[in-house]
Amino acid sequence: MRGTAGVPDQPVPTPTPSVPTSSSPVPKPPTQGNKKWCVPKAEATDAQLQSNIDYVCSQSGMDCGPIQANGACFNPNTVRAHASYAMNSWYQSKGRNDFDCDFSGTGAITSSDPSNGSCSFLS
């Protein structure tokens, strides 16, 4: 009902802006001492892992020298070992965001250092 002069009797509510809730996904920044690495999932096939190696090693700024013959991470000379190095290098260089370890569902985050022998993985 309107009062005199066409003014509403009750105040008109104003819309409030939508505010993201705490359930919105927000990547957590890496913290000192909280080291993580990206490695292949156990069920990833050699073909999928070779595709990951090919992709990472074709990108500008990525150094795949360590997984080439005579490189510090060439041995063990397996697709899985080479993919571990390449996938982790990508993950670390892109800021350690979990989504940078997806690799079409073939990557997994671990807190166990995959380095071995003379091969040191970035962390």
Swiss-Prot record:
<dbReference type="InterPro" id="IPR012946">
    <property type="entry name" value="X8"/>
</dbReference>
<keyword id="KW-0597">Phosphoprotein</keyword>
<keyword id="KW-1015">Disulfide bond</keyword>
<protein>
    <recommendedName>
        <fullName>Major pollen allergen Ole e 10</fullName>
    </recommendedName>
</protein>
<feature type="region of interest" description="Disordered">
    <location>
        <begin position="1"/>
        <end position="37"/>
    </location>
</feature>
<dbReference type="Pfam" id="PF07983">
    <property type="entry name" value="X8"/>
</dbReference>
<keyword id="KW-0020">Allergen</keyword>
<feature type="signal peptide">
    <location>
        <begin position="1"/>
        <end position="21"/>
    </location>
</feature>
<keyword id="KW-0968">Cytoplasmic vesicle</keyword>
<dbReference type="GO" id="GO:0009506">
    <property type="term" value="C:plasmodesma"/>
</dbReference>
<keyword id="KW-0732">Signal</keyword>
<feature type="disulfide bond">
    <location>
        <begin position="38"/>
        <end position="101"/>
    </location>
</feature>
<dbReference type="GO" id="GO:0031410">
    <property type="term" value="C:cytoplasmic vesicle"/>
</dbReference>
<comment type="function">
    <text>Carbohydrate-binding protein binding preferentially 1,3-beta-glucans. May be involved in pollen tube wall re-formation during germination.</text>
</comment>
<dbReference type="InterPro" id="IPR044788">
    <property type="entry name" value="X8_dom_prot"/>
</dbReference>
